[in-house]
Amino acid sequence: MKKLIFLIPLLLLIQPAFGEIIVENDQTYIGNDGILHIVGEIKNDSKSPVNKIKIIATLMDGDGKVLDTIDGKVLTNIIMPGMKGSFDIITNEKKIDNFFNYDLGFEYKLAAPKNQVIEIISSEMKRDQLNNLIISGTIENNGDITANMINVVATLYDRNGKVLTVSKIQTQPDFLRAGEESHFLI
């Protein structure tokens, strides 16, 4: 009986997030280098932030035989409740049959709550003279302390809302004092 009484308070302290973290909007494309990419988003519908997210892609041929297993990461370090995190799994496969499947799994840890204090206050998308897509903008630190190692992630969608590609940059300088702004270019 003492074991059961100990277990009940322990279970109340553990906040489950199973089933509330989902992979959505995933698809594949072949990059300019001929390499297969699997892109998509992870959505956090739990009440807790999650971090240390690892995506596991299992590539299979048309008969279900496993060809390869590849680990990938979400481009952000943490996904806050109600938010999404983009991923781009770059495979080792240059020659893939037209008939292949993949399964996605993931692992994560629950993280301590934190405030979302970095805000994109302006952004613009245009093409340069070589027809490359350029996204530029300004971020602001609305927190009380200096923020370090700030990443800006861009997720591009097709007209049907499917993820086309993702990109990430780290701002320079790599810190932003409270109340200050910084520019980014992706």
Regions found by a protein language model. Give the residues of each.
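Terminal connector regions
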Residues: 76, 90-132, 166, 173
